[in-house]
Regions:
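GT-A fold catalytic core of metal-dependent nucleotide-sugar glycosyltransferases
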Residues: 1-44
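A generic fold-level signal
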Residues: 3, 58-60, 119
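Short, flexible coil/linker segments at or flanking structured domains
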Residues: 12, 54-56, 93, 113
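Conserved catalytic core of nucleotide-sugar-dependent glycosyltransferases
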Residues: 27-91
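A glycosyltransferase accessory/donor-loop signature
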Residues: 65-166
Length: 166
């Protein structure tokens, strides 16, 4: 919690940014302890990548993109001991916060691939059901953004210093 000072951004690792993250940073609201995309949906798939079970539950995927107001007094509850002793549901559902302290971000900042239809304005795409790197999953998933995932992976692996196949 950065010694309970300033702001922080958390994002899951199964995402790609399609816009400048500074634009997300500009959405900070000092009156909120956290800001998230407040998804309200039922999943289209009961199974995720590699056969993982996928269930519906309250505030699903809210904690996958978070603007944390680390200095907000309500976040002083989030200590290492709290995180160690709380259930995953308690942490991911922000149970230490009153509802009015959880601010809303535009859905485009945590666009759920497959769960939502294609959106050319999505600023951050979340491959919450599985990334296209899982070949079996990618072949049957119907991902709207698989090509973008693979393009970004190639850019990540690319080196102008070497003309070697990866």
């Amino acid at each position: 919690m950065m010694n309970y000072q300033g702001w922080a951004i958390f994002i899951d690792g199964d995402m790609i940014l399609r816009d400048d993250i500074a634009k997300l940073w500009e959405l900070r609201d000092e009156s909120k302890a956290v800001q998230v995309v407040q998804h309200d949906y039922e999943t289209k798939m009961t199974e995720k990548y590699l056969g993982a079970k996928n269930e519906n539950y309250p505030k699903k995927n809210w904690s996958s993109v978070i603007l944390w107001n680390c200095a907000h007094p309500a976040n002083k509850t989030v200590t290492p001991d709290f995180v160690k002793s709380a259930t995953g549901a308690e942490v991911h559902r922000f149970t230490w916060l009153e509802d009015n302290l959880v601010g809303a971000l535009p859905t485009e900042w945590n666009w759920l691939d497959i769960e939502y239809d294609y959106n050319s304005d999505a600023r951050l795409v979340h491959y919450t059901l599985g990334t296209p790197c899982f070949a079996d999953f990618a072949a049957r998933s119907g991902s709207n953004y698989a090509a973008e995932w693979h393009r970004e992976r190639i850019y990540t692996d690319y080196s102008a210093q070497h003309d070697l196949p990866f």
